[in-house]
Design a protein with these regions (language model features):
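Short alpha-helical packing/oligomerization segments
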Residues: 116-162
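Transmembrane alpha-helical segments of multi-pass membrane proteins
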Residues: 12-19, 73-97, 169-186
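Transmembrane alpha-helical insertion/packing segments
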Residues: 1-69, 76-77, 95
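Long amphipathic alpha-helical segments with strong coiled-coil/leucine-zipper propensity
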Residues: 47, 58-113
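Cytoplasmic membrane-interface regions of multi-pass membrane proteins
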Residues: 1-6, 56-81, 142-175
Length: 209
């Protein structure tokens, strides 16, 4: 039975990757609905993205930068950087607006009670920092997914790709699984789930006036 499962994973790595993500995604939904401990939420999020993230890191880490320069057109080169700048500008603008809101909220909530100002500030930061981090993570995921498209394409198991031959050259079955799991759509979907679910897993903010 173990041999059969291993063979199936080798032949259809993307299908198994999607199934893995769906199982832990469903478990995450149940955990959120039943209000389980936050550590369980983070554990499920980590397990959900584990296969595609590890595979993506292995593929992109093995691919030299010269490969991307050879594959990129002038348009794609500037378009990806444009998207990165948009995400960066949005994150900066959000930090400025939220920073002003934090200052005002602390003053209003504390009502000249200096001993509570620091505590309120930390509570607000526990909400703001995860939101900004999630936005930057989303930008990182989109950029890596774009690189994956350029390196290995959209096929489940590409017959011709630009992944360096030295990546698991002596273990073709493992190479097939890694390249299959490093699918741009799978990595983008699971990565964006983290960007959406991550801030909510930190907890909700409650300030008593």
């Amino acid at each position: 039975m173990t041999v059969g499962i291993t063979t199936s994973i080798t032949r259809h790595p993307l299908v198994w990757g999607v199934a893995w993500s769906l199982v832990f995604g469903a478990a995450l939904v149940v955990a959120v609905m039943l209000d389980w401990h936050g550590l369980i939420d983070w554990l499920l999020i980590g397990l959900l993205v584990l296969p595609s993230t590890i595979a993506t890191v292995l593929v992109l880490a093995a691919t030299p930068r010269t490969h991307f320069e050879a594959m990129s057109s002038v348009f794609s080169h500037f378009f990806v950087r444009y998207l990165a700048l948009v995400f960066g500008l949005t994150a900066w603008g959000l930090s400025v607006v939220v920073g002003a809101a934090i200052s005002q909220s602390i003053q209003l909530a504390a009502e000249q009670r200096e001993d509570e100002i620091i505590g309120i500030g930390f509570d607000l930061m526990l909400v703001v920092v995860p939101l900004v981090a999630a936005l930057l993570w989303a930008a990182f995921v989109v950029r890596c997914a774009w690189f994956l498209v350029r390196v290995r394409g959209w096929a489940e198991v590409p017959t011709a790709d630009r992944v360096p031959e030295h990546l698991f050259a002596s273990r073709p079955a493992l190479r097939r699984i890694v390249v299959g799991l490093a699918h741009p759509a799978l990595f983008a979907a699971t990565g964006l789930v983290v960007a959406i679910a991550g801030p909510s897993a930190v907890g909700t903010l409650e300030i008593t006036f």
